[in-house]
Amino acid sequence: MGAKRERIQPDKLHVRKDGDKVLYSQVMVVEVGGTRQIFVAGQTPRDAHGSCVGMGDMRAQIEQVGRNIKDALEAAGATLADIVKTTTYVTDMDEYFKHQDMRMRFFSDALPTSTTVQVARLSRPEFMVEIEAFAIV
């Protein structure tokens, strides 16, 4: 018997479409062996309408991305405390590290494992940070 999968498109999150067709799932919940594994697609600093929050402001972008991850997890019945792994993509590592305290506001003492990678560009040129999250409940 295969794992049960549930795709979630939270109302609070913007999702890219081609016409009326959604191009990806914001959240995928996979139930395996009595646990719910929650995969949150890379969150960018978009608001629910698709506008970039914090143009040119890494700190504001990190805050918006954190809110988006929180909203995605809540839609799946989880919290930020359930995150076990994040992958962060940034366009300027030095600038990102100046604002680590903003990222830390979203986590309790049980910090998730984390990978941070600098990239040349994200999906839109004004985006400075994108974070994927993996949670287990």
Task: Walk through the language-model features, giving the residues of each.
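N-terminal presequence-like segments and the immediate start of the first folded domain
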Residues: M1-R67, D71-V84, V90-V137
